[in-house]
């Protein structure tokens, strides 16, 4: 074989190897981008569902929306703890009786999502009368409060929920033991 033919063969082989390598890297990068986009879509969807939960389900006292967003075996810790949707839903309906028109979550100044988790701070407006004090939420004459909700999602539903509330009366707040 001539020296020039050998050099041409080596160059062609190197070009083929380089082409395959670039193609493989592009496919790997494409898969990473697709995975990132899917993850972003999931995170954004969970945050949107959480907005729906707070603004329509909770503040709008819409128990159907409230129930649809929680898993049937939801585990809840915080102001109203529960180990299933039936109890969580009943607790919510009991609390709804004390919410006046315009009470509830009025904004989400902070919303974060990572993987299957969301962390949302909700600004609340409500006046809970003394007659509701037995509901573990504490009575308050304050109009403004905050809630931090950490939620773990599975298939578009909340599977675990951890609610920390500061309703204007720090002495009655579940959140109080974490603020020092």
Question: Language model features by range: what are they?
Answer:
Residues 44, 63-117, 139:
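A solvent-exposed, acidic/Ser-Thr-rich amphipathic alpha-helical stretch
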Residues 2-29:
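Single-pass membrane-anchoring alpha-helices
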Residues 22-68, 72, 179-180:
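Short, low-complexity N-terminal intrinsically disordered segments enriched in polar/charged residues
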Residues 80, 123-126, 165:
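A mature extracytoplasmic/lumenal domain signature
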Residues 122-155:
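Exposed beta-sheet edge and beta->alpha loop/turn motif
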Residues 92, 106-112, 146-152, 162-163:
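Hydrophobic/aromatic beta-strand elements that line small-molecule binding cavities or substrate pockets
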